Amino acid sequence: MNTIASEIFKAYDIRGIVGKSLTAEVVELIGKALGTEAIKRGGTEIVIGRDGRLSGPDFAKALARGMQSTGVHVVDIGVVATPMVYFAAIELGARSGVMITGSHNPPDYNGIKMVIEGETLALDAIQSLLRAIQANDFTVAASPGGYRTLNINDRYVNRIVGDVKLTRKMKIAMDCGNG
């Protein structure tokens, strides 16, 4: 049985303090639970993205390791905005996406938002992941799933630009101010 801080499993995401309740080891277990859940629902591929928090690269690697151990293929789209993970999951036909983000929380926090096979995981679905981790109830693949990186930025921008139809020429002024 795995010991894990149950309080990090919130109603609509998983989040905790980096290095305390949320470590790379914990994130790898979460990856195993998510990979197992995707497989149960008929999925074979999960897109992962992350924000710019310092723990993001290590957490992305750990998450991917856990998912791959179940046989799920991982597409890592790197540092992106959360909507880009959801876009990539649909655009690539994966139907599953996981965003590693601390959102509005202080810098020492990080977290995970999840969509598996088109369903945003929340409430009991998140508690089900916790139960799977506690019971060590994971799919174990004969061979690990694949891993690839992909830059989805141009496809995302082209989709947005393609969706906008102007009836007249637009003039825009922008002041970037402090960044």
Residue ranges with predicted function:
Residues 36-37, 73-76, 103, 124-130, ...:
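Short, surface-exposed, polar/charged, turn-prone segments marking secondary-structure boundaries
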Residues 34, 92, 133-136:
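Alpha-helix boundary/capping residues
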Residues 110-179:
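Gly/Ser/Thr-enriched, mixed-charge loops and adjacent short helices
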Residues 9-10, 15-19, 23, 80, ...:
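Generic, ordered loop/turn and secondary-structure boundary motif
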Residues 1-65, 69-71, 149-172:
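An N-terminal, well-structured beta->alpha segment
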